[in-house]
Amino acid sequence: MTLSPYLQEVAKRRTFAIISHPDAGKTTITEKVLLFGQAIQTAGTVKGRGSSQHAKSDWMEMEKQRGISITTSVMQFPYHDCLVNLLDTPGHEDFSEDTYRTLTAVDCCLMVIDAAKGVEDRTRKLMEVTRLRDTPILTFMNKLDRDIRDPMELLDEVENELKIGCAPITWPIGCGKLFKGVYHLYKDETYLYQTGKGHTIQEVRIVKGLNNPDLDAAVGEDLAQQLRDELELVQGASNEFDKDLFLAGEITPVFFGTALGNFGVDHMLDGLVEWAPAPMPRNTDTREVTATEEKFTGFVFKIQANMDPKHRDRVAFMRVVSGKYEKGMKLRQVRIGKDVVISDALTFMAGDRSHVEEAYPGDIIGLHNHGTIQIGDTFTQGEMMKFTGIPNFAPELFRRIRLKDPLKQKQLLKGLVQLSEEGAVQVFRPIANNDLIVGAVGVLQFDVVVARLKSEYNVEAIYESVNVATARWVESTDVKKFEEFKRKNEVQLALDGGDNLTYIAPTMVNLNLTQERYPDVVFRKTREH
């Protein structure tokens, strides 16, 4: 049975994001992945912060003139017979809710772990988000060219801390200065590492079979014997890879390598295109939509604002769920019930410019947005339904916003509500006073908000610390108990940008006590957009 051209395009797509703690090697791995996808010719071009981090690939220049930096947001490249979409999840200081929400637009994640450090804080948080949808996870243990922790220990830590089984696919031979390569458990092959080849794709020498004398000659008898001993242990103690369990998010295939030395990344990519799912079905408030449906549907998961005051433009990122996007097509923006013609969508196509006019399920397109599109918006060819599962997350950092000119309260509120619709920040209005509290998950969000209030709304504001530790959305089916709760806790209650009732806790202890005191009230960490 031959698939229709449309279904062939759907089957080729793989959409994933990389999750890691800052400095675990995400930027380097992104660069090496693009190198294998022939999106860039030589690595060493994704620079760190010092040079404003532009992954320079020629097709990314197109939006530069318009002053919107979408450079590293979405990268598409061919690999084997697939088309891979890699969504960037900002790390470091520009970490924000966008990072969380990007994970709702992918079908699979690659978790990168610094093998010298193991599971770190940011990785834990991002994994929690992937668990909301049981997203399949591949794992890459990075930095084998340095001294690392015991590989078995690393697997145990992932299993215990992140509650996901590990199925090693490759196993390291030595580490640091003694790093010799990896053995592939399912191909019964050893791939030998050469140093100094990080910027190019190298021809790797392969030794077939674990008991091959060539292996002892290549890595030394001691390391070869150590490998055989460790593998006996590994095969007895760890999970075998099972594709169904992987797709259910219950086990993660684990690869070892060094992104900097460009070794092992291709083994992981091979696994990704072979095992990761093609575009998955998505739930709406009325039915499930599958990628094979020919009518177009998509949802907005991120809005990127432009910090250049000369361009008021914002780009809404939409994940295509079903159907084919074609230039000039008419789509319905379900929330406002209006039909819009989309003629200038940005498509993120690597190299091949002739296909800029169309996009398929799994692809991400950018819509120009002049304040009319919100996060969570659904676009269809007329069907009235809304995609679910694009969450708001309870913020972890809070500040009070204060005006320099008290007469501008109205503009301030308008600005904050619009910025919260866009996902730049969350805003809370306490019921008991006139404060305005903003919440974020990354500290940079506050600076962005103050700068945008000034440039877009002509409001000069400053932020100051406030006694808030965390927030939870509250609801209850017991009206009487809920009224009592609201009456007794008025000082701690606020409305968010969408007028949803929120409990603002001064300390975690306070939150825990309040939750115990009111078992009939539900305290939620996430809320649907």
Curated annotation (Swiss-Prot):
Q: What is a GO molecular function of this protein?
A: translation release factor activity, codon nonspecific
Keyword set includes GTP-binding:
yes
Any single biological process term in GO: regulation of translational termination
* PROSITE patterns registered for this protein in UniProt: G_TR_1, G_TR_2
Q: Which residues form the signal peptide?
A: none
The similarity comment for this entry is:
Belongs to the TRAFAC class translation factor GTPase superfamily. Classic translation factor GTPase family. PrfC subfamily.
**What's the stated role of this polypeptide?**
Increases the formation of ribosomal termination complexes and stimulates activities of RF-1 and RF-2. It binds guanine nucleotides and has strong preference for UGA stop codons. It may interact directly with the ribosome. The stimulation of RF-1 and RF-2 is significantly reduced by GTP and GDP, but not by GMP.
What protein does this entry describe?
A: Peptide chain release factor 3
